Amino acid sequence: MKILITTDLYKPSINGVVTSITNLEKELEKQGHEVRILTVSPDNTSYKEGNVYYVKSMPSHIYPEVRVPFSRAGAMVKELVEWEPDVVHSQCEFFSFGFAKRIVELTGASFVHTYHTLYEQYTEYIPLGKRIGRAALAKWMKVRLKSVDTIIAPTKKVENVLQEYGMLQDIEIIPTGICLDKYRESVLEEEIEKLREELGIEETDRVLLSLGRLGFEKRIDELLYGMKEIVKTEEDVKLLIVGGGPARESLETLVAELELQDSVIFAGMVSPEDVKKYYCLGDVFVCASTSETQGLTYIEAAASGLPLICRKDSCLYGVLEEGGNGHSYQDIYRFAKCVREHIHDDKWLTNAGEHSRKIAEQYGTEMFGKKVAGIYRTVAWKGAVNYESFTICEKSANRI
């Protein structure tokens, strides 16, 4: 099949959406499908690089990394229409979605959309207020996605939200896959020791690992308040925060206010190639976010053999088994209690870590690619049946 993927976010950006798209692209090509990508360029020029079409753009000034195309990309759209894709798979609801919709209208291709982001998590920051903002969002999103044949939800959490919005399309839950081999590989002990030394982590310290983008919606400040409780009795526990983002400065200020300078370490952004080392350095993976839709870091941590202690959220369904490979919490005191009970229990850490690895096996990229390709075949078949039915009805009407 010919598959066109449209997205506002793509390489060189690094985030969960980009990871999902690149993994899908690789798996579809392995299956023999022809894949092309239409995205927003990282600068003000339009260009084509291999199978990727970049539409010139400018900074949005709305949110870091978000750019706005300022071209209708006529030549690129014309070329993609002439290519005649069987399926157009949009990955974002805003700028590139318009291109996707136009190409579907011009080609009759089947239209699939993956809903990656729970925007309602951000409505509390708008003047209208959370309740009114959510209602407006639901109405707008229902209209926006009206032309889509099937929506893919990465988790049950996302499916529930879309159903609350009143979406009428088929909604299929397909967890985003990760490359498990990358996290199965062992890292030399010498490399871990070197990293510990660089970060100022003693050999006897126990490490709580937080890894991901430092956005305000990630609620990392909650982990800091939890650490304030933990260090009252566990002075050898360190919180290692890996990643960069707009919340870093305020988090560093909070660390100083809570007098946690000796217990919290900011590693900054790290290259994708080095991420595995940080997972190996951690003893427990921690997360306070309730804005996740894919939970890729949960799966990466589990595949690396780490137990999970995370704020309770429906995104964790199937990834965190309470008491098996970790615990969920609903306040900082429960978080601190879970850490205190397990951080020095080597037997629990080992058993929970092994359980995490077993759970992660179901989230490989190969299975992800097969499930998505199955959706493509289904919507393409339905489209063909509907087209045939329409043609028959049209011919009958003409005879009359």
Where are each of the predicted segments found?
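N-terminal subdomain of nucleotide-sugar transferases
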Residues: 1-54, 367, 373, 377, ...
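Aromatic "clamp/platform" in nucleotide-sugar-dependent glycosyltransferases that forms part
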Residues: 290
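Donor nucleotide-sugar binding/catalytic pocket of nucleotide-sugar-dependent glycosyltransferases
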Residues: 39, 53-56, 134, 139-192
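Short hydrophobic beta-strand element within catalytic cores of glycosyltransferases
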Residues: 307-310
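Conserved donor-binding/catalytic core segment of Leloir-type glycosyltransferases
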Residues: 196, 202-218, 224-227
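Conserved acidic donor-binding segment of nucleotide-sugar-dependent glycosyltransferases
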Residues: 322-333, 341-347
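Nucleotide-activated donor-binding/catalytic signature segment of Leloir-type glycosyltransferases, i.e.
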Residues: 250-270
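Short alpha-helical donor nucleotide-sugar binding micro-motif in glycosyltransferases
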Residues: 144-145, 269-270, 277-282
